[in-house]
């Protein structure tokens, strides 16, 4: 398998991806990068969780609500039915992606990591929400009732490895104006702060939280 990337153009000494170069935010300290990302994820709550289907090998996404964060905001917890297909996927391949989008502002986040399925009742009870009963149902056997002691109720813990995200720097009027200017001048629009959190930065953060 070749490690060479894809290219369809030679731009010489000009940036091949001028939008990224114009918006990449590399001067922000790590604590701000983490805190801004964590705030964005918790405020949006709903994400798309992508796993590799254990039967077909294809990527599969589904909407999941963020239940809580750990390790100073970098690790994510989600409620899960332990008998669902996604737990089979994660047993087969622990690699996972979690993405968030604010469709109003255009802000987004993508978290790559590894996931584990946790059935520890203390953790389940800590983050249990009565609304989960609507998704688990009560099977009427006195055990599988959708409550915190229901063995089907588990937690998916996602440990971040890397993250990429974008937060808005302008309101909608400013964005439209900047994009319009870009169409006329060919200058890339500067509408977001693109930030990257490396594997080394994640490890450094986790060691102190």
From Swiss-Prot:
The gene is bli-3. InterPro entries: Split_barrel_FMN-bd, Stress-Dev_Protein, YdaG_split_barrel_FMN-bd. It comes from the Eukaryota. Residues 1-11 have a biased composition (Polar residues). The lineage of its organism: Eukaryota, Fungi, Dikarya, Ascomycota, Pezizomycotina. Induction: By blue light. Residues 1-24 are annotated as: Disordered. It comes from Neurospora crassa (strain ATCC 24698 / 74-OR23-1A / CBS 708.71 / DSM 1257 / FGSC 987). This is Protein bli-3.
């Amino acid at each position: 398998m070749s490690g060479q990337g894809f290219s369809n153009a030679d731009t010489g000494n000009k940036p091949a991806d001028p939008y990224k170069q114009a918006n990449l935010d590399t001067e922000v300290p790590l604590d701000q990068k983490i805190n801004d990302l964590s705030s964005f994820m918790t405020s949006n709550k709903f994400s798309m969780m992508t796993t590799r289907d254990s039967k077909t090998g294809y990527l599969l996404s589904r909407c999941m609500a963020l239940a809580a964060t750990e390790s100073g905001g970098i690790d994510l917890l989600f409620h899960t039915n332990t008998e669902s297909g996604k737990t089979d996927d994660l047993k087969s391949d622990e690699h996972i992606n979690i993405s968030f989008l604010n469709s109003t502002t255009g802000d987004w986040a993508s978290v790559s990591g590894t996931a584990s399925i946790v059935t520890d009742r203390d953790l389940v009870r800590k983050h249990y929400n009565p609304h989960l009963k609507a998704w688990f149902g009560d099977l009427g056997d006195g055990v599988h009732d959708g409550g915190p002691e229901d063995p089907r109720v588990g937690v998916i813990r996602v440990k971040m490895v890397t993250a990429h995200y974008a937060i808005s720097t302008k309101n909608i009027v400013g964005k439209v104006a900047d994009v319009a200017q870009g169409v006329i001048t060919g200058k890339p629009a500067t509408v977001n702060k693109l930030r990257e959190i490396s594997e080394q930065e994640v490890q450094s953060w986790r060691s102190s939280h």
